[in-house]
Design a protein with these regions (language model features):
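S-adenosyl-L-methionine-dependent methyltransferase catalytic module, highlighting the catalytic core
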Residues: 50, 55, 65-142
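Short, hydrophobic beta-strand segments that form beta-sheet elements in well-ordered domains
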Residues: 1-22
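Short, well-ordered alpha-helix to beta-strand connector turns
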Residues: 15-18, 33-35, 63, 115
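Non-membrane alpha-helical segments in proteins
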Residues: 41, 55-56
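Helix-to-beta-strand junctions that scaffold the AdoMet/dcAdoMet cofactor pocket
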Residues: 46-47, 60-62
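Conserved Rossmann-like nucleotide-binding pocket used by diverse enzymes
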Residues: 19, 38, 67
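Di-metal (Zn2+ and/or Mg2+/Mn2+) metal-binding site signature of metallo-dependent hydrolases
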Residues: 41-49
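A short acidic, Gly/Pro-enriched loop at the edge of an enzyme's catalytic core
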Residues: 26-40
């Protein structure tokens, strides 16, 4: 089963082929049950980002994937400093209801710490996309 995480009133996903799951329901989902989890721009609006990522990783079945997209703080800063983004636009991106904002490198590091293999990472404009896979138990020798 494939699920897409959404945050009611803040961020709604528009994805076909996914069952849509409210962010607050993550704890009630079965562990190791999902072949794909899609998280688009929700992490910035969560107070306990690391705990939430850890919980998501538990929900991925072996050989399953997680796709995470979000705003990259370095790219936003770079655009502001090069005057491609006004201060007002920057403030809107950084502070409009967000608890935190990170970079693609921060999220990749966290996913790797949790034992996932990074299959793809990309930054386009201010948004990053990461695809990571949960390896089978015997694929990650210690």
């Amino acid at each position: 089963m494939k699920i897409a995480i959404y945050l009611p009133g803040v961020f709604e996903t528009k994805t076909d082929g996914y069952e849509h799951v409210d962010l607050s329901e993550i704890g009630s989902l079965d562990d190791a049950a999902y072949e794909e989890i899609f998280v688009d721009s929700c992490l910035d609006f969560i107070e306990q980002r690391d705990d939430f990522i850890k919980e998501l990783v538990k929900k991925i079945r072996y050989a399953g994937q997680i796709i995470i997209s979000g705003s990259d703080v370095y790219e936003i800063s770079r655009a502001m400093m090069s005057k491609n983004l006004s201060l007002e636009e920057t403030n809107s991106i950084l502070y409009n209801g967000r608890y935190s904002i990170s970079s693609v490198l921060d999220v990749v590091t966290r996913l790797q710490q949790l034992g996932l293999n990074i299959l793809h990472k990309r930054v386009n404009d201010f948004k990053y996309t990461i695809i990571a896979e949960r390896p089978a138990p015997n694929e990650n020798p210690v």
